[in-house]
């Protein structure tokens, strides 16, 4: 199924990868998108579900592909829609996204797949990023409920 100008919505997953080192230091991984939509913007690692793949398996796979980290899916944080209009009244992108709180359990942080960059951010650094759509809300929710 094509992502741009799809015939029906695509189901995707997002990984809110939180590392809680101690009570005072909690950080989250974000990627700088290397492809459309939202090219060049900071966002959650994630992508489209593959046929036959569970949601939790998809979030683990996408996290590994885009960040180099092996993660454990802890809990579902929410379901979100991302609609990006195109030309002539058509929907250019339409995603239904299921975001999960994830804990890093291995691997090395590195940008991969369609990520142009990847890094850890603290809560204090988030406002300056101008995160895409509802990503800021789900990141804050993940930071608040981390383990």
Give the positions of each predicted feature.
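Conserved Nudix-box catalytic region and its N-terminal flanking loop in Nudix hydrolases
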Residues: 25-66
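A short coil-to-beta-strand element that immediately follows conserved catalytic motifs
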Residues: 70-79
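Short, solvent-exposed loop/turn segments that connect beta-strands within catalytic domains
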Residues: 21-26, 38, 88-91
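Active-site-adjacent beta-strand/loop module that shapes the phosphate/pyrophosphate-binding cleft
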Residues: 80-108
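Conserved beta-strand segments that form the floor/walls of ligand-binding pockets within enzyme
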Residues: 12, 43, 75, 99-101
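Conserved N-terminal beta-strand and adjoining loop/helix that marks the start
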Residues: 1-28, 101
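A generic structural micro-feature
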Residues: 5-9, 41, 90-96, 115
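Nudix hydrolase/Nudix homology domain
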Residues: 108-147
